[in-house]
């Protein structure tokens, strides 16, 4: 089997959430045949995994996907030269299956009928939900001032989700919640759950012991240019820091991730958070912390940062939004509250019972190992592809 995978960024080496999912999918697909991954941004991967080749759309080199104001809130409206190059690669490689990453690249699905290849739309999020969340996070004045524009953006995003899902032979979602959100937008065909992966399975060997959880050592990891994560850092600084300080105990919070915006730098300086930009090796950071605060209020999909923290043995302390779609049990697998200050108070209380914290960390690790390992993802992808029709029906 020959498999063509279109991605926004080069997934090798995987760093951010989207790259981590794309890389895991590529590895699973490579167990079934030759994989060519084609990206719109970044440079060609110097050493992709076995049975995977990588190249970029040369016409897009240096442009940046969202470098200019887009006429659409979620779709990258590809210039003619980019679309023509993608078409030529598709024709030359002659794949049996094409996997397209998310709505931004959904215009590529329009090429499928003339090539008669089976197609998969891999939805990392339900983008119309993310757009709605972003608008809901605006101030009341901003919502009123721009209500016509915001209404148009919501409608465009919903329509893009519906059309892309209808064009693809199969849609992959990372949670049952996202599958339900997509189905609520209109009729969809074959929707399959392909779970998000543990980014680095070596963290499963990090020790879990009571001593690790006595100290108030917290670590938040995420792409620091992504607005839901920026908001989470705000919640950590404004809501959690005062409660931790009021406990009278020493505490530390590390914020680490790619491409932090200036607002993140300012928040870390103001609230005494340690900022580590573009960390080279996450397991070291994770191994030094006992707790992972994840007070997310916006976004979709399932949080790779939750899986990563649990696999590494941290006690995850999260909002309902942060663990949405994962099937975790509050009080058993993680600490739960939708208020950042209350999350901090729960961490302080649990740190007084370090053995109970270790047991919660072990429960979280077991859950993600059983449901989000590379073996589990490969099994799900193999089954999904095996049950696709052999040829496009459209």
List where the protein language model places each region.
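Short hydrophobic beta-strand element within catalytic cores of glycosyltransferases
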Residues: 305-308, 315-319
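Acceptor-binding helix/loop patch of EC 2.4 sugar-transfer enzymes
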Residues: 61-72, 119-159, 223
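N-terminal subdomain of nucleotide-sugar transferases
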Residues: 1-55
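A charged, aromatic-enriched C-terminal amphipathic alpha-helix characteristic of glycosyltransferases
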Residues: 76-77, 355-385
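Conserved acidic donor-binding segment of nucleotide-sugar-dependent glycosyltransferases
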Residues: 334-341, 349-354
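Donor nucleotide-sugar binding/catalytic pocket of nucleotide-sugar-dependent glycosyltransferases
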Residues: 150-205
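Conserved catalytic-core segment of nucleotide-activated headgroup transferases in glycan assembly
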Residues: 21, 193-288
């Amino acid at each position: 089997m020959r498999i063509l995978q279109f991605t926004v960024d080069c997934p090798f080496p995987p760093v951010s959430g989207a790259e981590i999912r794309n890389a895991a999918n590529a590895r699973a697909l490579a167990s079934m045949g030759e994989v060519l991954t084609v990206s719109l941004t970044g440079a060609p991967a110097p050493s992709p995994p076995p049975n995977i080749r990588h190249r970029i759309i040369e016409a897009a080199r240096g442009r940046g996907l969202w470098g200019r104001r887009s006429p659409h809130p979620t779709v990258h409206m590809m210039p003619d030269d980019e679309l023509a190059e993608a078409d030529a690669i598709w024709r030359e490689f002659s794949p049996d299956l094409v996997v397209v990453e998310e709505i931004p690249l959904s215009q590529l699905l329009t090429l499928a009928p003339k090539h008669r290849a089976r197609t998969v739309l891999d939805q990392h999020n339900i983008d119309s939900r993310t757009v709605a969340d972003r608008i809901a996070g605006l101030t009341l004045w901003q919502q009123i001032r721009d209500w016509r524009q915001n209404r148009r953006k919501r409608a465009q995003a919903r329509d893009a989700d519906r059309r892309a899902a209808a064009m693809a032979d199969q849609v992959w979602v990372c949670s049952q919640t996202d599958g339900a959100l997509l189905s609520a937008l209109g009729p969809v065909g074959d929707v399959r759950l392909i779970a998000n992966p543990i980014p680095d399975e070596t963290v499963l060997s990090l020790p879990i012991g009571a001593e690790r959880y006595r100290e108030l050592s917290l670590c938040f990891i995420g792409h620091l240019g992504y607005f839901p994560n920026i908001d989470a850092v705000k919640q950590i600084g404004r809501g959690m820091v005062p409660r931790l300080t009021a406990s009278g105990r020493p505490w530390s919070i590390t914020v680490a991730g790619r491409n932090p915006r200036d607002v993140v730098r300012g928040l870390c300086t103001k609230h005494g958070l340690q900022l580590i930009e573009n960390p080279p090796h996450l397991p070291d950071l994770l191994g030094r912390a006992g707790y992972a605060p994840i007070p997310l209020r916006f976004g979709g999909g399932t949080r790779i940062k939750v899986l990563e923290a649990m696999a590494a043995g941290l006690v995850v302390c999260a909002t309902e939004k942060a663990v949405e779609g994962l099937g975790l049990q509050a009080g058993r697998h993680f600490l739960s509250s939708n208020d950042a200050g209350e999350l901090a108070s729960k961490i302080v209380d649990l740190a007084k019972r370090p053995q109970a914290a270790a047991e919660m960390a072990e429960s979280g690790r077991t859950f993600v190992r059983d449901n989000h390992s590379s073996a589990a993802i490969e099994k799900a992808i193999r089954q999904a592809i095996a049950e696709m029709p052999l040829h496009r029906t459209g």
